């Protein structure tokens, strides 16, 4: 989901001022070795000005970030990680995130490359959802 949010006050990042932001909200389903399933949610602001400071137009950077989130959704749905969320998240970053970023940057001019920080920020919503889902499978968390 892409959720528009207006800020209470303007936030300045270098030469750009942020008055609204789009939050990427994701849902991730996980399954443990016993076949138990849980769903988790994660959200992060796609703060274009902060994650990708550049003279490129806001719309170009914004569209690239949102497209990258959709690519991440596909990649996470196909990722076959096993273990604790810290291990799975680390493995995804090491095995998939860099390749996805290279793919996106391969489609862009050399002076318009999406930075690693932007890729990590987009991925953070999925990492949060992974931890949330894992938490639902742990008996120490009472969500009632």
Describe the residue ranges of each PLM region.
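Metal- or metallocofactor-binding catalytic centers and their adjacent structured scaffolds
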Residues: 38-137
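Flexible, glycine/charged-enriched surface loops at secondary-structure junctions
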Residues: 141-144
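Short, Gly/Pro- and small/polar-rich lid/capping loops
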Residues: 1-27
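Short beta-strand elements
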Residues: 22-32, 42-44
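Generic structural motif
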Residues: 3, 31-33, 45-49
């Amino acid at each position: 989901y892409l959720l528009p949010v207006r800020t209470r006050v303007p936030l300045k990042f270098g030469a750009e001022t942020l008055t609204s932001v789009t939050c990427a909200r994701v849902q991730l389903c996980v399954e443990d070795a016993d076949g138990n399933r849980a769903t988790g949610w994660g959200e992060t602001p796609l703060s274009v000005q902060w994650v990708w400071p550049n003279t490129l137009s806001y719309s170009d950077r914004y569209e690239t970030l949102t497209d990258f989130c959709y690519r991440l959704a596909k990649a996470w749905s196909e990722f076959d990680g096993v273990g604790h969320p810290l291990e799975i998240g680390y493995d995804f970053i090491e095995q998939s995130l860099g390749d996805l970023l290279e793919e996106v940057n391969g489609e862009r001019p050399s002076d318009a490359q999406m930075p690693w920080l932007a890729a990590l920020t987009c991925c953070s919503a999925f990492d949060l959802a992974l931890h949330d889902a894992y938490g639902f499978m742990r008996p120490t968390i009472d969500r009632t």
